[in-house]
């Protein structure tokens, strides 16, 4: 079994397949696992196995996603593939599958199609930083000029959405033929194309910065006063590291405050430092309990700033998902749940959009009634009377 060999001593990268329906995303996913399994770097996963993706609930939204893992000589990969277009939209917006990079699958026989464009735009909006292209079904195209034409079209499309189209690696091949070869136990020309694709993914998509190496950020969940010691705030560290003696800022809701960390505790034990993923209590010097509240964040000074206006890419839940039963219109005022708290905000719809129906995916402008620590890529939920009616990601800070 290949399973025994899986080790964590290689850098870990999250990727996924994106692209138009029926262009071969799932077949490529199966082909990658099959070709790499011949080298003992993966377990072979069947097409049907990947296609019958289990439904998962992410923030109340039902998403069908397949997760597979495999290795190359250089890295360990977690790979997501979604059966339906709506699943991709939900996945990318909720951040259920954070991708460090994506493999865009385009059929050489059809060229870029509407969802090809939509997935590239979504990647730009939700912050998928790198795209590598696999031109699939190349076995069905005899004309080399036609392949070149499709490649040019793909590069133009990437450029249009501010991806470096001219420098993006594009590999042409056939996922189906590679899968057939691997199943027959043959290392043929089509399998070689899949290996070439994975080499490009290894080279072109950088290893992500580990959460502990990023700037410190901790959303505040609760505030306590400990007599004789001062104020303690608790929460789960989102990124970075915090040490006793660090100068930090408290950002959001009220004007930004600067203070010093005088203690870090986990499970009532004193620690030298807390790091990404830890649930900790942080003791703050000279900070009054009434100056701090849930919804603010502790952070490294100047690393994140409070904002009230932003553009976001959102998915609005269907009635079946527990969302609204009716559309909403311009100036709709729900609550925006960011990290640990709700803040009311008003929504401005894009020009020409009269209303938004449950199940829609739309770009909105939001103005909050109180400032919140925000940056591009911050996720939020849209709530109404305590229930989630939408999910979104900040695509641009406006003010």
Curated annotation (Swiss-Prot):
Biological source species: Campylobacter curvus (strain 525.92)
Gene: tuf
Residue ranges of the region described as G3: 81-84
UniProt-recorded name of the protein: Elongation factor Tu
Pfam families from the UniProt entry: GTP_EFTU, GTP_EFTU_D2, GTP_EFTU_D3
Lineage: Bacteria, Pseudomonadati, Campylobacterota, Epsilonproteobacteria, Campylobacterales
CDD domains recorded: EF_Tu, EFTU_II, EFTU_III
Coiled-coil regions listed: none
Compartments, record wording: Cytoplasm
Molecular function GO labels: GTP binding; GTPase activity; translation elongation factor activity
Keyword Zinc-finger part of the UniProt annotation: no
